Amino acid sequence: MSDLIQANYRLLRVLPRFGIHLGFGDKSVVEVCRAQGVSMELFLLVCNISTFDDFLPDTAMFKGIDVEDIVLFLQNSHKYYLEQRIPEIRENLSSLEEGPVTSSARILDRFFNDYRNEVEAHFEYEEQTVFPYIRGLIHGVHTEGYSIEQFEENHSNIEDKLEDLKNILIKYLPGEVPAEELNRTLFNVFLLEDDLGRHALIEDK
């Protein structure tokens, strides 16, 4: 397991979503997953998605994995984004407000708050509608008036506003913005955008 983390530090953002924490010594991936009650197949699939930019999973790769494990991982990911990654960027933007470009920073802050609300609504839709529907199908219960095709139609691309935010940060803020704070904010936006894109690959399949 330690070799896996050494090979791709981005997996540090994946481990908590599986309930896996550092300190596993020389244990193998199999041993760590077994100890945490984690599906090794799902864990390795997520690792591949998180590591290789050209890795595109197909539906067949998920067939041997318990759907409940996938749903639980997606729920944990939602919690991770809402409680850690998004507040981190919000804090970055707040630090820009303390500089000499308060008005610009506040515009960014409002823009990001709108984005956060959109993400929360998107996740809430999945948590309250899509996931219960999937769990119902597993147990042979069909929800009248809803189909998975509706999820596909409503699965809006919540990365679009992050693209807009990146453009604002890169192109339009005055030069007086503290470079270190701006770079830190932009870096975290890039990380979130990349992570959400890989998260969407799992949801779509």
Model regions and ranges:
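Small-residue-biased structural context
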Residues: 1-205
